[in-house]
A protein has these predicted regions:
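The feature marks proteins involved in alpha-glucan
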Residues: 1-35, 67-151, 156-163, 173, ...
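Carbohydrate-binding surface patches
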Residues: 36-48, 534-560, 565, 570, ...
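Conserved, mostly hydrophobic/aromatic
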Residues: 42, 90, 152, 192, ...
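C-terminal beta-strand-rich structural cap/linker in extracellular carbohydrate-active enzymes
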Residues: 84-86, 638-673
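Intrinsically disordered, low-complexity terminal tails and inter-domain linkers enriched
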Residues: 551-593, 671-707
Length: 710
C-alpha cells in the first residue's frame, strides 16, 4: 500500500514541508486494485497499533487493523466497499495497552454534535462559479482596497425553526442572506467565527477538535463550499477565524492523541494554557508544524477562502503568557519569546505571501510585539494586517465618558495616529467587546436614549474616517441593546424601532460612501493619507482631519492637475507611464472620486453655530454626509482666505450637538501672500490649555518612536 504514502511523502512530512499533506492523511474515497472504497491514513507515532473502527464494522478494533508505514509513525489502510457519509474513528492501542478512540485529525467532515465521530466525504468534485472573483483578487492591491469587515457568528446571526439542527441556519441560506445583507449595507468581507468543528457551542469555535472539518452544525463541507461560492459571486470576501494557539482536552480530540503528548509539548509549562485549560501545540515538532501550515493552505485551496484571522497570537509569542514566575520556561537566550512559534509564523506567512493570489492573513495580537506586518525577509512575522487593540481600548474608553468630561480625555482619540503606521492595522469593534458584562455598543454610550444613538453615530463616523481597515461585529450596526450570546439570534426585530432603524440607515449610507470615495481607504498605510486639521480642540471636544487618495494631486494655477507635493514625477517617467502605474501625475484618470475628504466630529451636545475649520486652498467643499445621514441635496460651502488651525484657508459650518460633517474638495496650489482674517479664538483659558497640550504632544512625538512601547 506504499503507493498511497510514498517515500517522498514521508520525507516531506517528516521535515514539515508537505504542504498538501491533507491529500494523503485522513479519509479518501478511491479505487484500489479494482475495488472502490476509502483509504485512511493517520499519524500516531507512540501507538502500538491502530485500527479503523466504524459503523460498518461495529466499532470493532480487530476488524480493520491499519498497517504501520515503516518508522514514520503513520498508519494506513484501505476499506473496500466503504463510501461517503459513513461514521468512523481510529482505535489506538497505547503503550499502556489501552484502547482509546479518536476522531480523525485530518477528517474533512464531523458528526453533528454531541456525536464525535468523523464522517467520510469526497471533496474533489465540487463545481466552483467564482472564477471571476478569484482572478480579480489576484490583481487587487489589498492595502489600497476598501475593507469593511462584518464579523459574524453563524450560529447566532440568524436562527431557523429546524429542531433537527437546533435551529442552525444552513450554509446555503447563510450565504444567500449574508450576500444580500452585506451588499445592502456596504460591507466588503465577512469574517466567520466558529467554522472549524468544535464540540462546545459556548467556546464560540475557539476550542477546535476538527481543524479540517467545517462544522456540521450548518451542513456538509460541500454546503460550505457553496456558501463561499455564493458570497464570491456577490462580490463579498470570506475570512475565517483560525485557532493554531491551543486545542481542547476532549477525549476524542488531539490531546494525548496516541496515549502520549503528540500534538502538544510534553512539559505542561510549554504544553498547557493555565487560563483556558487547553493544550498548546508543539511548534518545534515538524509534523505538528506541517499539520497547521497545511491546514491553513487547505482552507485557501479547497474552500477558496480569502483570508484567515489568527486568534490569540500573543499567547503563542510569549512563553510567560498567562503564567506566574516559576510556571514557564525561558528560551535558550533566557527570554520570554517563543522562538519556535516565531519561526512557525515566519514559515507559514512566507508561504502565504508567495502565493501572490490575494490570499491574506490577519493577526489578532494584543501587545506591542514589533513588526507583525513586516515581511519575514525584513525581519517581521509576515502577517498582512493586525487588529488594532490599542485603538479599540482608547476609543471605547473615550466613548463611555460623559461628554462633560471628554475634554480631559481628548488625546485618547488622537493617540492612535501617533503609531498608526507602525503596522498595517485593522480597527476593530469585535465580539469580544460586547460580552461578559462589557455591554453592547449602544449600552456603552452615555446619556438618554436619543443621546446614546447620537454618540454612537459620531463614534462610528470617527472610526470610518480614521486610517486603517475596519471591522464591526454583527448587531452593532443597528444598536442591539443586549450583549451577544451564541445561544440565540441577534435582535433583528429592533429594525422596526425608530432609533435603531435610523442608526442602521446611517451606517448603510456611511459604508457605501466609504466604498465610493477612495480617499477613505486607498492611503490607509501612507503618511499622506491622513492629516489632522485640529487634533487639539479639547475644550470643545471637536475633531477634524483630512483623508487623501494615494499620490493625491493639487490643481495648479493654470488649472491643470499637478502631482502633489510628495508625488512629483520622476525625471525619467513619462506622463503616460505615470497614468498606467496610477502614480497621480498630470492628466491622470483613475477609478473613483479624486477628491480629498474633510471630517468634522463634535463629541458633545453643545451646538457650534459658526465653527471654522482650517482647509487647504480650494474653491469650495461639497457636503456629503451629516449626523442625519447622506446629504439629500447638493450643498457647497465656500473655502475662503483666513488663517485657521495653522492653515491659510478655512470654511465655516454650523455644527450641531453631536454633529458630524463630511466634505469632499479638490486641493489647489496655494498663493504665497499673507492672510488677513484670523480664525476665531477660544476664550483665554481654553487657548492656554490648548497651547499646553500642543507642546506636550509635540514633545511626545519627538521621543516616542512607538508610543505603545514607550
Amino acid at each position: 500500500m506504499d503507493r498511497f504514502f510514498s517515500e517522498l511523502d514521508r520525507y516531506l512530512f517528516g521535515v514539515g514541508r508537505h504542504y498538501q499533506i491533507y491529500e494523503k492523511m485522513g479519509a479518501h474515497p478511491c479505487t484500489f486494485e479494482g475495488k472502490e472504497g476509502v483509504y485512511f491514513a493517520v499519524w500516531a507515532p507512540h501507538a502500538k497499533a491502530v485500527s479503523l473502527v466504524s459503523d460498518r464494522n461495529g466499532w470493532n478494533p480487530e476488524a480493520n487493523p491499519m498497517i504501520r508505514v515503516e518508522d514514520s509513525g503513520i498508519f494506513e489502510c484501505f476499506v473496500p466497499d466503504m463510501g461517503e457519509n459513513e461514521l468512523y474513528k481510529y482505535a489506538i492501542l497505547t503503550q499502556k495497552d489501552e484502547w482509546i478512540y479518536k476522531a480523525d485529525p485530518y477528517g474533512f467532515f464531523s458528526e453533528f454534535r454531541p456525536g464525535t465521530a468523523s464522517v467520510t466525504t469526497d471533496l474533489t468534485n465540487f463545481s466552483w462559479n467564482d472564477k471571476a472573483w478569484m482572478e480579480a483578487r489576484k490583481k487587487k492591491n489589498m492595502d489600497e482596497s476598501p475593507m469593511m469587515i462584518y464579523e459574524v457568528h453563524l450560529g447566532s446571526w440568524k436562527r431557523e425553526g429546524n429542531p433537527e439542527r437546533n435551529g442552525f441556519i444552513s450554509y446555503q441560506k447563510a450565504g444567500r442572506d449574508l450576500a444580500e445583507y452585506c451588499n445592502y449595507m456596504g460591507y466588503t468581507h465577512v469574517e466567520l467565527m466558529g467554522i472549524a468543528e468544535h464540540p462546545f457551542d459556548g467556546s464560540w469555535g475557539y476550542q477546535v477538535t476538527g481543524y479540517y472539518a467545517p462544522t456540521s452544525r450548518h451542513g456538509s463541507p460541500k454546503d460550505f463550499m457553496e456558501m463561499v461560492d455564493i458570497l464570491h459571486e456577490a462580490g463579498i470576501g470570506v475570512i475565517l477565524d483560525w485557532v493554531p494557539a491551543h486545542f481542547p482536552k476532549d477525549a476524542h480530540g488531539l490531546a494525548d492523541f496516541d496515549g502520549e503528548a503528540c500534538y502538544e509539548h510534553p512539559d505542561s509549562r510549554l504544553g498547557e494554557h493555565p487560563d483556558w485549560g487547553t493544550k498548546i501545540f508543539n511548534y518545534g515538532k515538524t509534523e505538528v508544524q506541517n499539520f497547521l501550515i497545511a491546514n491553513a493552505l487547505y482552507w485557501y485551496e479547497l474552500y477558496h477562502i480569502d483570508g484567515l484571522r489568527v486568534d490569540a497570537v500573543a499567547s503563542m509569542l510569549y512563553l510567560d503568557y498567562g503564567r506566574r514566575d516559576g510556571e514557564w520556561l525561558p528560551n535558550r537566550f533566557g527570554g520570554n519569546g517563543n522562538l519556535e512559534a516565531i519561526e512557525f509564523f515566519k514559515h507559514l506567512n512566507s508561504i502565504i505571501r508567495k502565493r501572490e493570489d490575494g490570499s491574506m492573513i490577519i493577526a489578532e495580537e494584543s501587545t506591542a510585539w514589533p513588526d507583525i506586518t513586516k515581511s519575514p525577509e525584513e525581519g517581521g512575522l509576515g502577517f498582512h494586517f493586525k487588529w488594532n487593540m490599542g485603538w479599540m481600548h482608547d476609543f471605547l474608553a473615550y466613548m463611555k465618558e460623559d461628554p462633560l468630561y471628554r475634554s480631559y480625555h481628548h488625546n485618547k482619540m488622537t493617540f492612535g495616529m501617533s503609531y498608526a503606521y507602525s503596522e498595517k492595522f485593522i480597527l476593530v469593534l469585535s465580539h469580544d467587546e460586547v460580552v461578559h458584562l462589557k455591554r453592547s455598543m449602544i449600552e456603552k454610550m452615555p446619556g438618554i436614549e436619543e443621546e446614546r444613538f447620537q454618540n454612537l453615530k459620531a463614534g462610528y463616523f470617527f472610526m470610518l474616517g480614521h486610517a486603517g481597515k475596519k471591522l464591526l461585529f454583527m448587531g452593532q450596526d443597528f444598536g442591539q441593546y443586549s450583549e451577544w450570546s451564541e445561544a440565540r439570534s441577534i435582535d433583528w426585530y429592533l429594525l422596526e424601532e425608530k432609533e435603531n432603524r435610523s442608526l442602521h440607515n446611517f451606517m448603510r449610507d456611511l459604508l457605501h460612501l466609504y466604498r465610493e470615495y477612495p480617499a477613505f481607504y486607498e492611503a490607509d498605510y501612507e503618511y499622506e493619507g491622513f492629516s489632522w486639521v485640529n487634533a487639539d480642540d479639547s475644550s470643545r471636544s471637536i475633531y477634524s482631519f483630512i483623508r487623501n487618495r494615494k499620490n493625491h494631486y493639487v490643481i495648479g494655477k493654470s488649472g491643470e492637475k499637478a502631482a502633489g507635493k510628495n508625488n512629483a514625477l520622476k525625471e525619467t517617467e513619462t506622463e503616460e507611464a505615470s497614468e498606467s502605474k496610477g502614480t497621480g501625475g498630470k492628466g491622470l484618470h483613475r477609478k473613483g472620486h479624486e477628491e480629498s475628504l474633510l471630517f468634522v466630529v463634535n463629541m458633545t451636545p453643545v451646538e457650534r453655530a459658526d465653527y471654522w475649520v482650517g482647509m487647504p486652498k480650494s474653491k469650495e467643499a461639497k457636503l456629503l454626509f451629516t449626523e442625519e445621514g447622506k446629504a439629500k441635496e447638493e450643498k457647497y460651502f465656500p473655502v475662503v482666505k483666513g488663517e485657521c488651525d495653522g492653515r491659510n484657508y478655512h470654511l465655516a459650518y454650523p455644527l450641531k450637538g453631536y454633529g458630524i460633517a463630511l466634505f469632499s474638495f479638490v486641493e489647489e496650489e496655494e498663493d504665497r501672500e499673507a492672510n488677513t482674517k484670523p480664525c476665531p479664538e477660544e476664550d483665554s483659558i481654553e487657548k492656554k490649555g490648548r497651547d499646553e497640550r500642543k507642546e506636550k504632544t509635540r514633545q511626545g512625538e519627538l521621543v516616542a518612536k512607538n508610543p505603545r512601547t514607550a
